[in-house]
Regions:
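Glycine/threonine-rich beta-strand-loop-alpha-helix active-site module
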Residues: 78-85, 92-182
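ATP/NTP phosphate-donor binding region
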Residues: 1-97
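C-terminal charged capping/lid subdomain of soluble metabolic enzymes
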Residues: 11, 303-364
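Glycine-rich phosphate/pyrophosphate-binding beta-alpha loops
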Residues: 147, 254-279, 284
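Carboxylate- and glycine-rich phosphate/diphosphate-binding segment that chelates Mg2+/Mn2+
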Residues: 155-259
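Catalytic phosphate/nucleotide-handling subdomain of diverse soluble enzymes
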Residues: 270-309
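Short alpha-helical scaffolding segments that buttress acidic/His motifs in well-ordered protein cores
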Residues: 200-204, 246-254, 268, 288, ...
Length: 364
């Protein structure tokens, strides 16, 4: 009997808790997953390395360990390798689990560490699609800023020695996610906007893509609607209500691309991130600002949002690149073939030449 594997059998987060104050349930959730006295490792954004922060609410037991990590730069394969090496050398047994508390960068870091604790070699060896062979250890995602969809995706995006690319696998997806809108309090306006626009751009690229299907469309349309409620419409939503809606927009946006793909903005943003270290959210905004030819309606709405919230989108960041830097940036962008195919179709290579990519980068 032949087996038809035409359709992807992709994983979803098996357990999620949502609600104000749900972070307080973390200890009881983890107690059920602890393997004797093997530690839980908490990887936490270092913005919380201060008194009175969420870190004070983390209950450490036995030899649990809290590691602060910076999100000022995109997570790197080398950073993952160091964390894994340190954990394996410090503990005689594998941890009970890894918990990532922060934005997309920290959650991606936690996912990558959970994978590399059970797979040999460097994280760079697994950048790509379905290269992971061994199941990760238990891992939990707790977003403190919403938009990236990292809490629900099957990838963890890393900058490596050659490229910026995710470890895409069925084992990457979190085993548990905690969605507490109260954790979004205190995010700066610019970061709130940039990260939320990552979600909006996910939706546009998914809904306008050639990979679109009913599954992706249903999630993408809901995320798009929620983004408009939060960022564009004049309504009487409280900050707390907006945080809850943005948290669900991020979730739905991530689900939308799980069964399709992103597009031009993400491909080119990866180039900016790899060469210039541009953070993902702001990188997407910089690129999307110039994509009227590909997403006219989406870009028009994006510009209204920028104006409404008085956000400054950086310009001229590619004006002083060396020839080598520009060529590397183009190489990274064009290497993301599934993204271009989703955006432009199977013949995308005839449409998106190196010179076109170069010309677009020079506008930024």
């Amino acid at each position: 009997m032949s087996v038809n594997n035409e359709y992807r059998n992709f994983p979803m987060v098996p357990r999620v808790v949502f609600g104000k104050g749900s972070f307080n349930q973390l200890t009881s959730i983890l107690d059920l997953k602890r393997k004797k006295q093997a530690p839980f490792i908490f990887i936490v954004d270092d913005v919380f390395d201060q008194s009175g922060s969420i870190a004070d609410k983390i209950e450490l037991k036995y030899n649990d360990k809290l590691i602060y990590a910076s999100s000022k730069e995109e997570p790197k394969t080398s950073q993952v390798d160091v964390l894994v090496k340190n954990i394996l050398s410090e503990f005689s047994e594998l941890p009970s689990g890894i918990i990532g508390i922060g934005g997309g960068s920290i959650m991606d870091l936690a996912k990558a560490v959970s994978l590399m604790l059970t797979n040999e070699g460097s994280a760079a060896d697994y950048q790509g699609w379905d290269l992971i062979k061994t199941k990760s250890i238990y891992h939990v995602g707790i977003p403190t800023i919403s938009g990236t969809g990292a809490e629900v995706s099957r990838t963890c995006v890393l900058s490596g020695p050659v490229r910026k690319l995710g470890i895409n696998s069925d084992y990457t997806t979190f085993d548990q996610v905690v969605l507490d809108p109260l954790l979004l309090d205190g995010v700066s306006k610019n970061q709130w906007f940039y990260t939320g626009m990552d979600c909006f751009i996910h939706c546009v690229e998914s809904l306008e893509g050639t990979f679109l299907n009913d599954f992706s469309q249903s999630y993408g349309e809901k995320a798009y609607e929620l983004c408009l409620e939060v960022y564009l419409e004049d309504n009487n939503l409280t900050v707390e209500e907006k945080n809850g809606k943005l948290m669900m927009a991020s979730w739905h946006g991530g689900m939308s691309i799980a069964y399709s793909q992103v597009g031009v903005a993400h491909a080119m943003s990866y180039g900016l991130g790899f060469v210039l270290g541009t953070k993902h959210g702001i990188g997407n905004c910089i690129v999307f600002n110039y994509l009227e030819d590909y997403y006219p309606e989406g870009v028009a709405i994006f510009k209204k949002m920028v104006k409404k919230h008085q956000i400054d989108i950086p310009k001229g960041i590619c004006s002083n690149l060396s020839v080598e830097q520009m060529e590397t940036m183009i190489n990274v962008a064009l290497s993301l073939e599934p993204l271009w195919e989703n955006a432009l179709g199977k013949d995308w290579k005839k449409i998106m030449t190196r010179e076109k990519v170069r010309a677009m980068y020079l506008k930024m």
